[in-house]
């Protein structure tokens, strides 16, 4: 048991180093490449994480480049790496303003034109919608974690916050839901852990909701939760 715990900790340290060094290199290239499609080509270097760590990301479904809003559950820092590595479009993340203020790391967001929101600002929703329109006009699909923060990677999602709903309704967006399974087992920063586990990205079929229905957002969460549970039980049986 102690041997397994030590092994998991050492694996986590190695993966943390791969992420830290890789991110540093990508940020440098992003700076010089930032005017070229928001450095999308250098951001794709996130795929090196998988070859350097031996992690195999199982992918089910396909990316729909016609979808303008991507919603997915959140477990780990790796969730961002998963999409940055493989999504074919110049995606734009919607993240907390505090992340952009982290020394050095913040450049990964600010140099690439991501949307940073101030949750404490009562007028923040106006700024958010203005920024979303700007990115949509640039043909950049928006990506948001509707839970708003990292979950624990168990069976249940955290309650969805209203941000994704407001954005989708305002711009009548086609949505592609996605679910991530076991990314927290591949790398968890608090506590520092990493396991040998299967991990999967499931890309559900895109659709434009019936925005006149008062329950469409709850139905989206139920759909994602159901799909997540199916794969969660399969990978963790």
UniProtKB/Swiss-Prot annotation:
Protein name, as recorded: 1-acyl-sn-glycerol-3-phosphate acyltransferase
Family, similarity comment: Belongs to the 1-acyl-sn-glycerol-3-phosphate acyltransferase family.
Protein purpose: Converts lysophosphatidic acid (LPA) into phosphatidic acid by incorporating acyl moiety at the 2 position.
Coiled-coil annotated residue ranges, if any: none
Membrane topology: Peripheral membrane protein
GO molecular function: 1-acylglycerol-3-phosphate O-acyltransferase activity
Protein origin, superkingdom: Bacteria
Catalytic activity: a 1-acyl-sn-glycero-3-phosphate + an acyl-CoA = a 1,2-diacyl-sn-glycero-3-phosphate + CoA
Keywords: Acyltransferase, Cell inner membrane, Cell membrane, Lipid biosynthesis, Lipid metabolism, Membrane, Phospholipid biosynthesis, Phospholipid metabolism, Transferase
This protein's record includes keyword Cell inner membrane: yes
Domain notes: The HXXXXD motif is essential for acyltransferase activity and may constitute the binding site for the phosphate moiety of the glycerol-3-phosphate.
Gene Ontology CC annotation, any one: plasma membrane
SMART domains per UniProt: PlsC
Functional pathway: Phospholipid metabolism; CDP-diacylglycerol biosynthesis; CDP-diacylglycerol from sn-glycerol 3-phosphate: step 2/3
Motif mapping: HXXXXD motif: 74-79
One family name in Pfam for this protein: Acyltransferase
Upper taxonomic lineage: Bacteria, Pseudomonadati, Campylobacterota, Epsilonproteobacteria, Campylobacterales
The EC number(s) this enzyme carries: 2.3.1.51
């Amino acid at each position: 048991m102690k041997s397994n715990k030590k092994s998991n900790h050492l694996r986590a340290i190695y993966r943390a180093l791969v992420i830290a060094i890789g991110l540093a290199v990508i940020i440098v290239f992003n700076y010089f490449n930032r005017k070229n499609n928001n450095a999308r080509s250098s951001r794709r270097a996130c795929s090196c994480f998988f070859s350097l760590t031996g992690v195999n990301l199982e992918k089910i479904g396909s990316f729909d480049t016609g979808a303008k809003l991507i919603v997915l559950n959140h477990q780990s820092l790796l969730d961002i790496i998963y999409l940055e590595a493989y999504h074919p479009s110049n995606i734009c993340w919607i993240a907390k303003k505090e992340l952009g203020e982290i020394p050095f790391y913040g450049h990964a967001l600010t140099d690439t034109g991501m949307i940073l929101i101030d949750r404490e600002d009562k007028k923040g929703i106006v700024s958010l919608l203005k920024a979303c329109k700007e990115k949509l006009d640039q043909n950049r699909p928006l990506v948001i974690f509707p839970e708003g923060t990292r979950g624990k990677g168990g069976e249940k999602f955290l309650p969805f916050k209203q941000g994704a709903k407001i954005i989708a309704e305002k711009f009548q967006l086609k949505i592609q839901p996605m679910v991530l399974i076991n990314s927290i087992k591949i790398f968890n920063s608090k506590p520092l852990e990493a396991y040998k586990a299967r991990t999967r990205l499931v890309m559900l079929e895109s659709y434009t909701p019936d925005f006149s229905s008062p329950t469409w957002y709850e139905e989206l969460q139920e759909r994602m939760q159901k799909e997540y549970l199916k794969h969660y039980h399969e990978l963790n049986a």
